Amino acid sequence: ADNQHPTVYQKVASQMHLSSSLSQDVHARYGGIQRPALSQRRFPYGNYSNAGLQTCQATQDLSLIAANASPVFVQAPQEKGLAAFATDFLMGGVSAAVSKTAAAPIERVKLLIQNQDEMIKAGRLSEPYKGIGDCFSRTIKDEGFAALWRGNTANVIRYFPTQALNFAFKDYFKRLFNFKKDRDGYWKWFAGNLASGGGAGASSLLFVYSLDYARTRLANDAKAAKKGGGGRQFDGLVDVYRKTLKSDGVAGLYRGFNISCVGIIVYRGLYFGMYDSLKPVLLTGKMEDSFFASFALGWLITNGAGLASYPIDTVRRRMMMTSGEAVKYKSSFDAFNQILKNEGPKSLFKGAGANVLRAVAGAGVLAGYDKLQVIVFGKKYGSGGG
Protein backbone atom coordinates (compact mmCIF):
# COMPACT_ATOMS: atom_id res chain seq x y z
CA ALA A 1 0.00 0.00 0.00
CA ASP A 2 2.85 2.37 0.76
CA ASN A 3 4.02 2.25 -2.84
CA GLN A 4 0.63 3.45 -3.99
CA HIS A 5 0.41 6.47 -1.71
CA PRO A 6 2.79 9.36 -1.09
CA THR A 7 4.56 9.63 2.24
CA VAL A 8 3.85 12.52 4.56
CA TYR A 9 6.69 14.44 2.94
CA GLN A 10 5.06 14.36 -0.47
CA LYS A 11 1.65 14.97 1.07
CA VAL A 12 2.91 17.99 2.94
CA ALA A 13 4.59 19.12 -0.25
CA SER A 14 1.28 19.07 -2.07
CA GLN A 15 -0.64 21.03 0.56
CA MET A 16 -0.81 24.23 1.19
CA HIS A 17 -3.03 26.44 2.01
CA LEU A 18 -1.35 26.16 2.67
CA SER A 19 -3.39 25.59 0.14
CA SER A 20 -3.82 28.87 -0.65
CA SER A 21 -1.94 28.83 0.47
CA LEU A 22 -0.98 32.84 -3.85
CA SER A 23 -1.40 28.56 -2.29
CA GLN A 24 -1.53 29.38 -1.35
CA ASP A 25 0.52 26.91 -2.12
CA VAL A 26 2.18 25.47 -5.32
CA HIS A 27 5.25 24.12 -7.35
CA ALA A 28 3.47 20.91 -8.32
CA ARG A 29 0.20 22.11 -6.86
CA TYR A 30 -1.00 23.13 -10.25
CA GLY A 31 -2.66 20.29 -12.04
CA GLY A 32 -1.03 18.77 -15.08
CA ILE A 33 2.52 20.04 -14.69
CA GLN A 34 5.90 18.53 -15.31
CA ARG A 35 7.76 18.56 -11.99
CA PRO A 36 11.36 19.75 -11.91
CA ALA A 37 13.81 16.99 -12.68
CA LEU A 38 15.36 16.95 -9.20
CA SER A 39 12.10 16.02 -7.54
CA GLN A 40 11.89 12.88 -9.68
CA ARG A 41 15.24 11.25 -9.00
CA ARG A 42 17.74 9.81 -6.58
CA PHE A 43 15.47 9.55 -3.53
CA PRO A 44 13.14 6.53 -3.73
CA TYR A 45 9.87 7.14 -1.89
CA GLY A 46 7.35 4.86 -3.62
CA ASN A 47 6.11 6.57 -6.76
CA TYR A 48 7.47 9.91 -5.57
CA SER A 49 11.00 11.14 -4.98
CA ASN A 50 13.19 13.68 -3.22
CA ALA A 51 11.00 14.26 -0.22
CA GLY A 52 13.19 17.02 1.14
CA LEU A 53 12.64 19.41 -1.71
CA GLN A 54 8.96 18.60 -2.04
CA THR A 55 8.29 19.03 1.67
CA CYS A 56 9.40 22.62 1.81
CA GLN A 57 7.72 23.47 -1.45
CA ALA A 58 4.48 23.06 0.45
CA THR A 59 5.20 25.43 3.26
CA GLN A 60 4.07 28.59 1.50
CA ASP A 61 0.34 28.50 0.97
CA LEU A 62 -0.77 31.72 -0.56
CA SER A 63 -4.30 30.81 0.20
CA LEU A 64 -6.90 29.88 -2.40
CA ILE A 65 -4.82 30.61 -5.46
CA ALA A 66 -2.22 28.01 -4.80
CA ALA A 67 -4.63 25.60 -3.19
CA ASN A 68 -7.08 25.55 -6.05
CA ALA A 69 -4.42 24.50 -8.47
CA SER A 70 -3.10 21.60 -6.43
CA PRO A 71 -2.86 18.15 -8.01
CA VAL A 72 -4.99 15.43 -6.51
CA PHE A 73 -3.19 12.55 -4.86
CA VAL A 74 -6.36 10.52 -4.53
CA GLN A 75 -6.63 8.88 -7.91
CA ALA A 76 -9.63 9.08 -10.23
CA PRO A 77 -12.34 6.38 -10.06
CA GLN A 78 -11.35 4.68 -13.32
CA GLU A 79 -7.81 4.18 -12.00
CA LYS A 80 -8.53 2.39 -8.75
CA GLY A 81 -12.23 1.67 -8.32
CA LEU A 82 -15.08 3.75 -6.95
CA ALA A 83 -14.96 2.43 -3.38
CA ALA A 84 -11.23 3.04 -2.96
CA PHE A 85 -11.57 6.44 -4.61
CA ALA A 86 -14.39 7.46 -2.27
CA THR A 87 -12.39 6.31 0.76
CA ASP A 88 -9.31 8.26 -0.28
CA PHE A 89 -11.42 11.29 -1.17
CA LEU A 90 -13.12 11.34 2.23
CA MET A 91 -9.94 10.60 4.17
CA GLY A 92 -8.22 13.36 2.22
CA GLY A 93 -11.04 15.64 3.30
CA VAL A 94 -10.54 14.71 6.94
CA SER A 95 -6.81 15.27 6.55
CA ALA A 96 -7.39 18.70 5.02
CA ALA A 97 -9.92 19.59 7.72
CA VAL A 98 -7.50 18.60 10.49
CA SER A 99 -4.54 20.56 9.10
CA LYS A 100 -6.62 23.63 8.21
CA THR A 101 -8.40 23.66 11.57
CA ALA A 102 -5.12 23.36 13.48
CA ALA A 103 -3.62 26.26 11.56
CA ALA A 104 -6.82 28.36 11.53
CA PRO A 105 -5.86 30.66 14.45
CA ILE A 106 -2.64 31.70 12.73
CA GLU A 107 -4.49 32.03 9.43
CA ARG A 108 -7.05 34.37 10.97
CA VAL A 109 -4.32 36.48 12.55
CA LYS A 110 -2.58 36.66 9.17
CA LEU A 111 -5.79 37.89 7.51
CA LEU A 112 -6.51 40.41 10.26
CA ILE A 113 -3.03 41.92 10.03
CA GLN A 114 -3.08 41.85 6.24
CA ASN A 115 -6.43 43.64 5.93
CA GLN A 116 -6.41 45.86 9.02
CA ASP A 117 -6.13 49.09 7.03
CA GLU A 118 -9.36 48.34 5.15
CA MET A 119 -11.05 47.51 8.46
CA ILE A 120 -9.91 50.80 9.99
CA LYS A 121 -11.16 52.76 6.96
CA ALA A 122 -14.54 51.04 7.24
CA GLY A 123 -14.71 51.78 10.97
CA ARG A 124 -14.55 48.11 11.92
CA LEU A 125 -11.24 48.21 13.78
CA SER A 126 -10.40 50.77 16.45
CA GLU A 127 -6.60 50.80 16.14
CA PRO A 128 -3.86 48.97 14.17
CA TYR A 129 -2.35 45.74 15.43
CA LYS A 130 1.22 46.05 16.69
CA GLY A 131 2.20 42.57 15.55
CA ILE A 132 1.26 38.89 15.61
CA GLY A 133 1.27 38.67 19.42
CA ASP A 134 -0.85 41.80 19.82
CA CYS A 135 -3.36 40.53 17.25
CA PHE A 136 -3.67 37.19 19.05
CA SER A 137 -4.16 38.76 22.48
CA ARG A 138 -6.63 41.43 21.32
CA THR A 139 -8.71 38.92 19.36
CA ILE A 140 -8.95 36.56 22.34
CA LYS A 141 -9.70 39.43 24.74
CA ASP A 142 -12.37 41.07 22.56
CA GLU A 143 -14.00 38.03 20.95
CA GLY A 144 -13.03 34.96 22.97
CA PHE A 145 -10.69 32.05 22.26
CA ALA A 146 -13.09 30.28 19.87
CA ALA A 147 -13.11 33.36 17.61
CA LEU A 148 -9.64 32.40 16.38
CA TRP A 149 -11.40 29.79 14.21
CA ARG A 150 -13.85 32.26 12.66
CA GLY A 151 -14.03 31.63 8.90
CA ASN A 152 -12.51 28.16 9.14
CA THR A 153 -15.73 26.39 8.13
CA ALA A 154 -15.72 27.99 4.68
CA ASN A 155 -12.04 27.15 4.34
CA VAL A 156 -12.66 23.47 5.09
CA ILE A 157 -15.78 23.23 2.93
CA ARG A 158 -13.99 24.37 -0.20
CA TYR A 159 -11.67 21.35 -0.10
CA PHE A 160 -14.30 19.06 -1.61
CA PRO A 161 -15.35 21.10 -4.67
CA THR A 162 -11.71 22.01 -5.23
CA GLN A 163 -10.67 18.36 -5.39
CA ALA A 164 -13.58 17.44 -7.65
CA LEU A 165 -12.78 20.32 -9.98
CA ASN A 166 -9.13 19.34 -10.06
CA PHE A 167 -10.19 15.92 -11.36
CA ALA A 168 -12.21 17.66 -14.07
CA PHE A 169 -9.56 20.13 -15.22
CA LYS A 170 -6.10 18.71 -14.55
CA ASP A 171 -6.08 16.06 -17.30
CA TYR A 172 -7.48 18.47 -19.87
CA PHE A 173 -4.80 21.09 -19.30
CA LYS A 174 -2.10 18.44 -19.04
CA ARG A 175 -2.96 17.24 -22.55
CA LEU A 176 -3.29 20.79 -23.84
CA PHE A 177 0.15 21.95 -22.64
CA ASN A 178 2.11 18.71 -22.55
CA PHE A 179 5.58 20.13 -23.21
CA LYS A 180 8.72 18.24 -22.18
CA LYS A 181 11.85 20.13 -21.18
CA ASP A 182 14.20 17.71 -22.96
CA ARG A 183 12.01 17.42 -26.06
CA ASP A 184 10.64 20.93 -26.60
CA GLY A 185 13.27 23.06 -24.89
CA TYR A 186 13.25 25.03 -21.65
CA TRP A 187 11.18 28.04 -22.70
CA LYS A 188 8.35 26.01 -24.24
CA TRP A 189 8.28 23.83 -21.14
CA PHE A 190 8.35 26.91 -18.90
CA ALA A 191 5.53 28.61 -20.86
CA GLY A 192 3.53 25.38 -20.85
CA ASN A 193 3.85 25.14 -17.07
CA LEU A 194 2.60 28.70 -16.65
CA ALA A 195 -0.27 28.14 -19.08
CA SER A 196 -1.39 24.80 -17.65
CA GLY A 197 -1.08 25.99 -14.05
CA GLY A 198 -2.88 29.23 -14.83
CA GLY A 199 -5.62 27.53 -16.82
CA ALA A 200 -6.32 24.76 -14.32
CA GLY A 201 -6.04 27.11 -11.36
CA ALA A 202 -8.30 29.78 -12.84
CA SER A 203 -10.89 27.19 -13.91
CA SER A 204 -11.17 25.76 -10.40
CA LEU A 205 -10.97 29.22 -8.87
CA LEU A 206 -14.01 30.33 -10.84
CA PHE A 207 -16.20 27.86 -8.97
CA VAL A 208 -14.84 28.15 -5.43
CA TYR A 209 -13.67 31.76 -5.27
CA SER A 210 -16.78 32.92 -3.43
CA LEU A 211 -15.97 30.56 -0.55
CA ASP A 212 -12.56 32.18 -0.12
CA TYR A 213 -14.25 35.57 -0.30
CA ALA A 214 -16.66 34.51 2.46
CA ARG A 215 -13.80 33.10 4.53
CA THR A 216 -11.88 36.37 4.18
CA ARG A 217 -14.86 38.50 5.22
CA LEU A 218 -15.66 36.30 8.23
CA ALA A 219 -12.05 36.21 9.40
CA ASN A 220 -11.82 40.00 9.18
CA ASP A 221 -15.15 40.60 10.91
CA ALA A 222 -13.68 41.89 14.16
CA LYS A 223 -16.15 42.24 17.00
CA ALA A 224 -14.62 45.19 18.84
CA ALA A 225 -15.23 48.06 16.46
CA LYS A 226 -16.79 51.49 16.62
CA LYS A 227 -19.13 50.74 13.72
CA GLY A 228 -22.09 48.59 14.69
CA GLY A 229 -21.68 49.19 18.42
CA GLY A 230 -19.14 46.43 18.87
CA GLY A 231 -21.23 43.85 17.04
CA ARG A 232 -20.31 41.75 14.04
CA GLN A 233 -21.02 42.65 10.43
CA PHE A 234 -21.91 39.06 9.47
CA ASP A 235 -23.74 36.35 11.41
CA GLY A 236 -22.16 33.48 9.51
CA LEU A 237 -21.30 32.01 6.11
CA VAL A 238 -24.81 32.24 4.65
CA ASP A 239 -25.17 35.80 5.91
CA VAL A 240 -22.01 36.82 4.02
CA TYR A 241 -23.54 35.59 0.76
CA ARG A 242 -26.91 37.16 1.51
CA LYS A 243 -25.58 40.61 2.39
CA THR A 244 -22.99 40.70 -0.39
CA LEU A 245 -25.50 39.67 -3.06
CA LYS A 246 -27.93 42.28 -1.76
CA SER A 247 -25.41 45.15 -1.79
CA ASP A 248 -23.11 44.27 -4.70
CA GLY A 249 -24.66 41.40 -6.62
CA VAL A 250 -22.63 38.44 -7.88
CA ALA A 251 -19.75 40.79 -8.73
CA GLY A 252 -19.25 41.39 -5.01
CA LEU A 253 -18.43 37.72 -4.47
CA TYR A 254 -15.77 37.84 -7.21
CA ARG A 255 -14.01 41.09 -6.37
CA GLY A 256 -10.28 40.50 -6.83
CA PHE A 257 -10.77 37.44 -9.05
CA ASN A 258 -8.72 38.72 -12.01
CA ILE A 259 -5.64 39.56 -9.96
CA SER A 260 -5.98 36.17 -8.26
CA CYS A 261 -5.66 34.43 -11.63
CA VAL A 262 -2.61 36.57 -12.43
CA GLY A 263 -1.17 35.56 -9.09
CA ILE A 264 -1.16 31.88 -10.06
CA ILE A 265 1.04 32.60 -13.08
CA VAL A 266 3.29 35.03 -11.20
CA TYR A 267 3.98 32.54 -8.40
CA ARG A 268 4.68 29.72 -10.85
CA GLY A 269 7.01 31.91 -12.89
CA LEU A 270 8.95 32.92 -9.79
CA TYR A 271 9.09 29.38 -8.47
CA PHE A 272 10.36 27.69 -11.62
CA GLY A 273 12.65 30.59 -12.46
CA MET A 274 14.31 30.45 -9.03
CA TYR A 275 14.44 26.66 -9.10
CA ASP A 276 16.25 26.45 -12.42
CA SER A 277 18.62 29.24 -11.44
CA LEU A 278 19.60 27.97 -7.99
CA LYS A 279 19.47 24.19 -8.35
CA PRO A 280 22.52 23.83 -10.68
CA VAL A 281 24.51 26.19 -8.45
CA LEU A 282 23.67 24.87 -4.97
CA LEU A 283 22.92 21.17 -5.45
CA THR A 284 26.17 19.86 -6.89
CA GLY A 285 28.40 16.92 -5.99
CA LYS A 286 27.58 15.39 -2.60
CA MET A 287 24.96 18.06 -1.97
CA GLU A 288 22.87 16.63 -4.80
CA ASP A 289 22.14 13.53 -2.72
CA SER A 290 21.58 15.41 0.54
CA PHE A 291 18.05 15.38 1.93
CA PHE A 292 18.71 18.45 4.07
CA ALA A 293 20.29 20.39 1.21
CA SER A 294 17.28 19.75 -1.00
CA PHE A 295 14.98 20.61 1.92
CA ALA A 296 16.80 23.91 2.44
CA LEU A 297 16.67 24.72 -1.27
CA GLY A 298 12.96 23.95 -1.42
CA TRP A 299 12.32 26.12 1.64
CA LEU A 300 14.33 28.97 0.15
CA ILE A 301 12.63 28.83 -3.24
CA THR A 302 9.10 28.38 -1.93
CA ASN A 303 9.31 31.17 0.61
CA GLY A 304 11.22 33.42 -1.78
CA ALA A 305 8.61 33.06 -4.49
CA GLY A 306 5.83 33.33 -1.92
CA LEU A 307 7.21 36.50 -0.40
CA ALA A 308 7.81 38.09 -3.80
CA SER A 309 4.23 37.39 -4.90
CA TYR A 310 2.63 38.16 -1.52
CA PRO A 311 1.61 41.72 -2.55
CA ILE A 312 -0.78 40.19 -5.09
CA ASP A 313 -2.50 38.25 -2.31
CA THR A 314 -2.73 41.46 -0.29
CA VAL A 315 -4.26 43.39 -3.18
CA ARG A 316 -6.88 40.74 -3.94
CA ARG A 317 -7.94 40.45 -0.31
CA ARG A 318 -8.04 44.20 0.16
CA MET A 319 -10.34 44.33 -2.87
CA MET A 320 -12.57 41.66 -1.30
CA MET A 321 -12.90 43.83 1.79
CA THR A 322 -14.52 46.67 -0.19
CA SER A 323 -17.61 44.66 -1.20
CA GLY A 324 -20.57 46.27 0.53
CA GLU A 325 -18.63 49.48 1.19
CA ALA A 326 -19.42 52.85 -0.40
CA VAL A 327 -15.91 53.40 -1.76
CA LYS A 328 -14.28 50.66 -3.82
CA TYR A 329 -11.09 50.31 -5.80
CA LYS A 330 -11.61 50.81 -9.54
CA SER A 331 -9.32 47.89 -10.37
CA SER A 332 -6.49 45.82 -8.93
CA PHE A 333 -4.04 48.33 -10.40
CA ASP A 334 -5.89 51.16 -8.66
CA ALA A 335 -5.82 49.20 -5.39
CA PHE A 336 -2.09 48.62 -5.73
CA ASN A 337 -1.42 52.30 -6.42
CA GLN A 338 -3.61 53.56 -3.57
CA ILE A 339 -2.04 51.19 -1.04
CA LEU A 340 1.45 52.26 -2.10
CA LYS A 341 0.55 55.95 -2.09
CA ASN A 342 -1.38 56.07 1.18
CA GLU A 343 0.27 53.35 3.27
CA GLY A 344 3.67 52.64 1.74
CA PRO A 345 5.17 49.42 0.34
CA LYS A 346 5.36 47.76 3.78
CA SER A 347 1.58 47.51 3.84
CA LEU A 348 1.67 45.08 0.91
CA PHE A 349 3.58 42.60 3.08
CA LYS A 350 1.52 42.80 6.27
CA GLY A 351 0.81 39.32 7.60
CA ALA A 352 3.59 37.62 5.63
CA GLY A 353 5.32 36.44 8.82
CA ALA A 354 2.13 34.86 10.14
CA ASN A 355 1.65 33.19 6.76
CA VAL A 356 4.96 31.33 7.12
CA LEU A 357 4.04 30.26 10.67
CA ARG A 358 0.68 28.99 9.42
CA ALA A 359 2.38 26.80 6.84
CA VAL A 360 4.68 25.26 9.44
CA ALA A 361 1.78 24.54 11.80
CA GLY A 362 -0.28 22.93 9.06
CA ALA A 363 2.62 20.75 7.92
CA GLY A 364 3.35 19.57 11.45
CA VAL A 365 -0.23 18.57 12.17
CA LEU A 366 -0.48 16.79 8.82
CA ALA A 367 2.60 14.74 9.69
CA GLY A 368 1.01 13.65 12.96
CA TYR A 369 -2.30 12.83 11.28
CA ASP A 370 -0.50 10.72 8.67
CA LYS A 371 1.08 8.69 11.47
CA LEU A 372 -2.34 8.23 13.08
CA GLN A 373 -3.78 6.86 9.84
CA VAL A 374 -1.06 4.20 9.71
CA ILE A 375 -1.76 3.19 13.32
CA VAL A 376 -5.55 3.05 12.92
CA PHE A 377 -5.98 1.89 9.32
CA GLY A 378 -2.62 0.31 8.59
CA LYS A 379 -2.07 2.53 5.54
CA LYS A 380 -1.70 6.11 4.40
CA TYR A 381 -4.61 7.64 2.52
CA GLY A 382 -4.53 10.34 -0.12
CA SER A 383 -4.12 13.77 1.37
CA GLY A 384 -6.19 16.75 0.43
CA GLY A 385 -4.76 19.87 -0.91
CA GLY A 386 -6.60 23.13 -1.13
UniProtKB/Swiss-Prot annotation:
ADP binds at R158, K170, R316. The keyword Transmembrane helix applies. It holds the Pfam family Mito_carr. Solcar repeats lie at residues 83-176, 188-281, 289-375. Keywords: Antiport, Membrane, Mitochondrion, Mitochondrion inner membrane, Repeat, Transit peptide, Transmembrane, Transmembrane helix, Transport. Its main location: mitochondrion. Residues 316-321 are annotated as: Important for transport activity. SUPFAM superfamilies: Mitochondrial carrier. It catalyses: ADP(in) + ATP(out) = ADP(out) + ATP(in). It is a multi-pass membrane protein. GO terms for molecular function: ATP:ADP antiporter activity. ADP:ATP antiporter that mediates import of ADP into the mitochondrial matrix for ATP synthesis, and export of ATP out to fuel the cell. Cycles between the cytoplasmic-open state (c-state) and the matrix-open state (m-state): operates by the alternating access mechanism with a single substrate-binding site intermittently exposed to either the cytosolic (c-state) or matrix (m-state) side of the inner mitochondrial membrane. Monomer. This is ADP,ATP carrier protein, mitochondrial.
